[in-house]
Amino acid sequence: MEGGGGSGNKTTGGLAGFFGAGGAGYSHADLAGVPLTGMNPLSPYLNVDPRYLVQDTDEFILPTGANKTRGRFELAFFTIGGCCMTGAAFGAMNGLRLGLKETQNMAWSKPRNVQILNMVTRQGALWANTLGSLALLYSAFGVIIEKTRGAEDDLNTVAAGTMTGMLYKCTGGLRGIARGGLTGLTLTSLYALYNNWEHMKGSLLQQSL
């Protein structure tokens, strides 16, 4: 009988442990001695302070050897596509303006609409091709300079812009090359200055203090 009772108790305890009711747990007295870090209690299952698990910045899973920031090659697709779309939009607006100006003495009719539409299409394609070509040259020079120097900084931006202007205006002789290079140098220098304006202002403020 006693053996049967003991067997029954073991069976009951095994079932209770299986459903999580009979296992040993942590009481309030056991958890009362666990120190707090801020407002988060330390887990009894971890030997690591949760403060070290908090990341101040977003972290992404990257392939081995990959950079956290996009390089020139990745940005080239966005740059070329954005310039083409911007050129098409600007050219379409300019074509609409020119079309309305050239046909202002004509009555609203099908020939006038066709002429305006042709002007919009022609100007849109022209500006999209122009800005897209400039973006392609700029991106290609940027990738080549980055791979050659092994670094990505504002010097690459200025050099790529200068070389783009020089190559784009190379058909105009030495004067055209100089003018294109100066234009590219000026635009990219202003862009680099705009990107680093906050950093420069903070550095000047620290020096003044």
From Swiss-Prot:
Gene Ontology cellular-component terms listed: mitochondrial inner membrane; mitochondrial intermembrane space; mitochondrion; TIM23 mitochondrial import inner membrane translocase complex
GO molecular function, one term: protein transmembrane transporter activity
Signal peptide feature range: none
Presence of the UniProt keyword Transport in the record: yes
Keyword line: Membrane, Mitochondrion, Mitochondrion inner membrane, Protein transport, Translocation, Transmembrane, Transmembrane helix, Transport
Superkingdom: Eukaryota
Membrane spanning stretches: 73-93, 125-145, 181-197
Subcellular location per the Swiss-Prot or TrEMBL entry: Mitochondrion inner membrane
Membrane topology annotation: Multi-pass membrane protein
Assembly and binders: Component of the TIM23 complex at least composed of TIMM23, TIMM17 (TIMM17A or TIMM17B) and TIMM50; within this complex, directly interacts with TIMM50. The complex interacts with the TIMM44 component of the PAM complex and with DNAJC15. Upon mitochondrial depolarization, interacts with PINK1; the interaction is required for PINK1 accumulation at the outer mitochondrial membrane, kinase activation by autophosphorylation and PRKN recruitement to mitochondria.
Role description: Essential component of the TIM23 complex, a complex that mediates the translocation of transit peptide-containing proteins across the mitochondrial inner membrane. Has a role in the activation of stress-induced mitophagy by protecting PINK1 from OMA1-mediated degradation and facilitating its accumulation at the outer mitochondrial membrane in response to depolarization.
Name of this chain's protein: Mitochondrial import inner membrane translocase subunit Tim23
Organism whose genome encodes this protein: Homo sapiens
Gene name tied to this protein: TIMM23
